[in-house]
Each structure stands twice: as structure tokens, then as C-alpha cells.
Regions:
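Cysteine-nucleophile amide-bond enzymes
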Residues: 1-159
């Protein structure tokens, strides 16, 4: 059985380069503005018997909707199991429709300011919510999507 999760970034970027400082500032700004502990989210699918996950999301750092394979260490990421029937197939189909679409910075700000973003661009929690079939996906921050789905899985299990 394919294990699908909402992965929520709670980590703190380390480093002192201008790029790393900018990323840290942006993570902090998202957490403050949304009054939450998360600054980003992904739909994560366990990848075989490794510690890696196939992660689907819209990312400002990566330029828009993309798939990325990466580990999700428990000190930086919380995982909430998605127990939706056919969730994996739904995610794959939605990704096929939206892959490569640009990041929606104005839409991400709109979660806080109440303004609409672009219908042709995506921000992380909007993309994840839409892929899961949530109504009005553009209204969700990473924290609000986590609250909607439930509490993070505390004990990670190998699948």
C-alpha cells in the first residue's frame, strides 16, 4: 500500500549566506503572518525502503509546481497521514495537470490579506489542498491545512 502524507516544514534554515538568510527570513515571516508553526507543506509519498519521499508541491525556492525526492527528518518535518481512498492516484493526476505551473507569491500573501491570487499559479498549501479536493484551497495556510487534516503522526513507521 502506498503511504501518502501531508508533510509540514517546521525546521529552521541554517547557514549565513545571503540566500540562506533570505530563506530563513521568509520561513519566519510565513510563521508569524499565519500564526502557525509551519512555513511550507508538501504531499509526500514514501519512496520504497529508503528514508526518502517523493514530494509534490508548489515551491517558491524551486520556481513553482514540482516533484522532488528528499528525506523528511522528524526534527524538521511533521507528517500527517492522508487516509483518503485513491489519494495517491488523485495526487498523480493533479500533478500531471499542474506540473511546471509558476509559484503564486501574491496568492500566498492573499491567505493573510484576503486577496485573490492567480488561477494559473500556485502556492504550497493551495496546491496541496486542491490536490486533496479541498474546497476553496486558496484560503489555506500550511498551518490551517494541518489543522483541517488532523494532528501530525508522532511515531513514524517504516512502510
Amino acid at each position: 500500500m502506498t503511504r501518502v502524507y501531508l508533510a509540514l516544514y517546521k525546521g529552521r534554515k541554517r547557514g549565513t549566506s545571503p540566500r540562506e538568510l533570505w530563506q530563513r527570513l521568509m520561513d519566519w515571516a510565513v510563521r508569524i503572518a499565519t500564526r502557525g508553526q509551519y512555513s511550507h507543506c508538501e504531499i509526500a509519498v514514501k519512496h520504497g525502503f529508503t528514508d526518502d519521499y517523493h514530494c509534490y508541491s508548489a515551491s517558491l525556492r524551486d520556481g513553482g509546481v514540482r516533484l522532488k525526492t528528499m528525506p523528511l527528518p522528524a526534527d524538521k518535518w511533521d507528517l500527517i497521514p492522508i487516509n483518503q481512498l485513491d489519494a495517491y492516484i488523485d495526487i498523480l493526476n493533479y500533478f500531471a495537470q499542474t506540473r511546471g505551473k509558476p509559484y503564486d507569491f501574491i496568492g500566498a500573501c492573499g491567505v493573510i490579506l484576503g486577496i485573490k491570487g492567480s488561477l494559473k499559479k500556485w502556492f504550497c498549501s493551495e496546491w496541496c489542498a486542491a490536490a486533496l479536493g479541498v474546497q476553496y484551497p486558496d484560503r489555506y495556510s500550511p498551518q490551517e491545512l494541518a489543522d483541517w487534516l488532523g494532528q501530525p503522526e508522532k511515531a513514524r513507521q517504516k512502510s
